[in-house]
Amino acid sequence: MSSAVASKGMNQGSEFDDNKDMCPICKTDRYLSPDVRFLVNPECYHKICESCVDRIFSLGPAPCPYKSCDKILRKNKFKTQIFDDVGVEKEVDIRKRVFNVFNKTLEDFDNDLEAYNKYLEEVEDIVYKLDNKIDVVETEEKLRTYEELNKQLIMNNMERSKKDLENFEQRQQFEKEMRMKKRMLERQIESEDKMNKEWAKREIVNRLASSTNADDVIEGVKNTVKLKKSSARRKLEEINRVLQNNPYSSLMLSQGLSRKEDNVPFTPFNGDRDLDKRYTIDQESYDDPFIKDLENRKDYIASGFRSDFVYDRMLTEAFMGLGCVVAEEV
């Protein structure tokens, strides 16, 4: 039985070809042909080089050249393999196809997180069945029926996703340009500061030659340097204000505020963010001989041991959550 399993494993390995750099059809490899490109077809995901695809499928649909495969393939369906693992490649393609149909977002459920999670679980079930070939006919029919019944919703969600992507790209481009201008102004200011420092040194020496009051000379040179500063600093301040008040960020914020408040699941750890402690540590009125003894041991001192840390942790654990009313949080 073990030999049969081994034989089966060898057949599967030869089917998908363990040699990633050689075409299993024409035996062309990257060592002799560095520019060779390998393609796969979503029908069966068998790896074939580009030359074999052109030679076999140029005249129209043809059977897969792999002996164990009976799929009919078309040339326009071949694509470059992105992932080394064919299983991952197949799952990613299935997810793309399913998510193009089941493309609802949390907004479509009025921010009802529970309903949205059930929807996502249903989508994951479809992906799992298609990926593992479980009830493929029924699952494909379900996918097709949903697409026919929700064409308008699918198109609207695609348009919304497209607009969100465009806004994101515009924001990225805007911030990139602002940062570039900021760097240029910072270099200009740095160069001017260097020149002003050199000028100030020379000017102080020249003025001290005809004046005995060093403080007045230094103060006068400082005031002159302040007046000589160019408009680059004002431009830099303006860019910083623009970056802080990013119009794209404010747009996204306004969209977020217009949505309903999310139903955040209850967490018992809200107390860990309390800034005001509900207790004070009074070590003088509490004597713990065990803890006090540890303060004198070198192996504990070396690790940064402090008795107040111990008391602080114990009191934190005791008082944490006292201000949290579970009935109001759930």
Swiss-Prot record:
CC annotations in GO: transcription factor TFIIK complex
Subcellular location: Nucleus
PROSITE patterns: ZF_RING_1 (PS00518), ZF_RING_2 (PS50089)
Keywords: Metal-binding, Nucleus, Transcription, Transcription regulation, Zinc, Zinc-finger
UniProt-listed InterPro entries: Cdk-activating_kinase_MAT1_cen, MAT1/Tfb3, Znf_RING, Znf_RING/FYVE/PHD, Znf_RING_CS
GO molecular function: cyclin-dependent protein serine/threonine kinase activator activity; zinc ion binding
Chain segments annotated as transmembrane: none
Broad class of where this protein is predominantly found: nucleus
Residue ranges covered by zinc fingers (RING-type): 23-68
GO biological process: nucleotide-excision repair; regulation of transcription by RNA polymerase II; transcription initiation at RNA polymerase II promoter
Function description: Acts as a component of the general transcription and DNA repair factor IIH (TFIIH or factor B), which is essential for both basal and activated transcription, and is involved in nucleotide excision repair (NER) of damaged DNA. TFIIH as CTD kinase activity and DNA-dependent ATPase activity, and is essential for polymerase II transcription.
PANTHER family to which the protein is assigned, alphabetical: CDK-ACTIVATING KINASE ASSEMBLY FACTOR MAT1
Name assigned to this protein: RNA polymerase II transcription factor B subunit 3
Record gene name: TFB3
